[in-house]
Amino acid sequence: MQEKFMKLAVRQALIAKEKDEVPIGAVIVKDGNVVARAHNLMEKTQLATAHAEILAINKACKKLKSWRLDGAEIYITVEPCAMCAGAIVNARISKVYFGAYENKSGCAQSKYPVLTDNGLNHSTEFVGGVMQDVCANIIKKYFKEKRAKKS
């Protein structure tokens, strides 16, 4: 099941890449059904908060008519940053699955364990490395191409 939903998140990341956005995708699933999918839109919107996770959470909350996403799972192509990890915790998402680890800003495990911080009012389980090679290659290729264009 993890791979099935992560493939949908990968599809979202590829849509972002086509739009020249940082290729990160997110899918929220509840009771085995996809309730939201999104990809980064920071360049288009010029909003620092237009990360795939935040956009997917907003869509899921609207669809389910609740800010509490208890029992939901989120599939993300890259380990969430501090902002997104905080939003995941605040939304009460039950489990996070992510693909590529993000050593510079990942806040599930790599930099700071926001999702499992006992000092917060809620914590969220996570599984990292789901389709890791596929997810990591998408982001690496994107930034390699960006650097080549600057040269």
Predicted regions, residues:
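Short beta-strand scaffold segments in enzyme catalytic cores
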Residues: 24-32
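Small-residue (primarily alanine) positions within well-ordered alpha-helices
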Residues: 9, 13-16, 26, 36, ...
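Active-site phosphate/pyrophosphate-handling residues
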Residues: 4, 33, 55
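Short, basic and Ser/Thr-rich N-terminal targeting/leader segments
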Residues: 20-24, 70
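Short beta->alpha transition motifs characteristic of CBS
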Residues: 35-42, 123
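Helix-adjacent hinge/juxtasegments
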Residues: 46, 50, 54-91
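Residues that line or immediately flank small-molecule/substrate-binding pockets and catalytic motifs
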Residues: 42, 76, 100
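Zinc-dependent deaminase
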Residues: 1-19, 67, 80-151
